[in-house]
């Protein structure tokens, strides 16, 4: 009797363990299935933070090579997606490289490995590794490259150095009173009404709208052939140009009318929260040589090319990571005492004219915080795959001192 009971209990313990194991395995499979992310989905999520559409027109950002439907294993972040970095991705089992600079900048007529660009792209394709570039999409972001430089320098009262022009649109639409909040909510969720550090910004006016449905219509209100008068709300919102299509779609989806009346206007206002470069003020003013030593220390520089000393103390500082000679004029207009950038030519230094201290700190050096910056963003947002930083210094410029 006892042996039969023991066998019965033992049998059920074994079955219970098998059942427990079965359940755990299937729960894990379910979790893993839910959390898998494709490259296309990854880019969509990245764009919620750093919209690729805010990149400069000349730039080449987004997915440069790779299958957007492939599932992500791991992500490697780098400054330049060179062949050596692609090999590093292979070793780290990363099938996505998120790079700052686009390895493909202009069109490729062939991919045979005859130069450094083709070698990197060919190796990525052969190993099924996708390359995604951000470049000026991150440059133009308020909290992008230049904001990080300002943070490292301890600047405050930050403003965009070269605000984007012809970047803002205004939408005006007319909605029955009872549906105004519904339409506004849809517009806000699509990205309209964001102005600096405020969102859901709009302006509304009450009025009377008229219309007469004719043959072929399917009116939400009224009858065919009869003129209708409706109490309506005029809603006005501002948005960035690259959001236009998504905002119009959201408005039409939420609006009750078959034919939605709306106008879109280009406005002359500069976008004060998107653009290249940034400027702000140091906590305390510095002598020029003291400032240069301060910059050398913060950026771990061996050398700084600079214009002649002005004899003025440094308080207001402008920065533009990468090639930034085009920002000298803006730095002067904003009465900056110093301007940090890179790739300035011989004649660019003449434009200082004893009014500003121009500092060329090197292209790579000026953008050196980008990899860490992206690592912090991705590590916080994505938890279903490993994110790592490239250990390879891709700076092509060397100094003999």
Write out the residue ranges for each language-model feature.
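Cysteine-centered motifs
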Residues: 2-6
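Aromatic (phenylalanine/tyrosine) cluster motif
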Residues: 8-10, 16, 20-22, 33
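N-terminal low-complexity, intrinsically disordered patches enriched in charged
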Residues: 10-11, 371
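Hydrophobic structural segments
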Residues: 18, 27-401
């Amino acid at each position: 009797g006892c042996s039969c009971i023991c066998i019965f209990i033992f049998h059920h313990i074994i079955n219970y363990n098998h059942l427990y194991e079965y359940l755990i395995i299937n729960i894990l499979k379910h979790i893993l299935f839910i959390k898998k992310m494709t490259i296309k989905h990854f880019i969509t999520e990245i764009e919620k933070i750093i919209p690729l559409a805010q990149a400069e027109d000349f730039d080449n950002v987004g997915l440069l090579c790779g299958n957007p439907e492939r599932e992500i294993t791991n992500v490697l972040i780098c400054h330049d997606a060179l062949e050596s970095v692609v090999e590093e991705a292979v070793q780290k089992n990363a099938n996505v490289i998120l790079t700052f600079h686009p390895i493909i900048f202009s069109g490729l007529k062939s991919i045979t490995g005859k130069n450094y660009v083709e070698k990197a792209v060919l190796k990525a394709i052969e190993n099924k590794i996708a390359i995604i570039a951000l470049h000026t999409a991150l440059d133009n972001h308020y909290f992008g490259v230049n904001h990080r430089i300002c943070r490292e320098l301890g600047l405050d009262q930050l403003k965009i150095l070269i605000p984007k022009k012809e970047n803002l649109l205004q939408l005006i639409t007319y909605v029955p009173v009872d549906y105004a909040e519904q339409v506004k909510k849809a517009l806000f969720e699509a990205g309209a009404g964001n102005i600096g550090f405020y969102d859901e910004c709009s302006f509304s006016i009450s009025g009377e709208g008229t219309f007469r449905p004719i043959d072929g219509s399917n009116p939400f209100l009224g009858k065919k052939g009869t003129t209708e008068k409706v109490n309506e709300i005029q809603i006005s919102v501002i948005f960035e140009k690259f959001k236009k299509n998504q905002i119009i779609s959201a408005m039409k989806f939420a609006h009750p009318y078959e034919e939605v009346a709306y106008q879109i206007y280009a406005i002359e206002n500069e976008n004060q929260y998107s653009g290249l470069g940034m400027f702000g003020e140091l906590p305390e003013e510095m002598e020029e040589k003291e400032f240069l030593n301060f910059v050398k220390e913060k950026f771990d520089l061996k050398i700084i090319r600079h214009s002649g000393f002005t004899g003025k103390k440094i308080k207001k500082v402008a920065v533009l990571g990468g090639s930034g000679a085009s920002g000298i004029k803006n730095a002067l207009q904003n009465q900056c005492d110093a301007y940090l950038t890179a790739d300035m030519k011989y004649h660019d230094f003449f434009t200082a004219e004893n009014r500003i201290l121009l500092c060329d700190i090197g292209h790579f050096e000026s953008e050196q915080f980008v990899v860490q910056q992206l690592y912090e963003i991705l590590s916080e947002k994505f938890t279903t795959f490993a994110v790592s930083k490239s250990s390879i210094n891709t700076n092509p410029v060397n100094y003999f001192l």
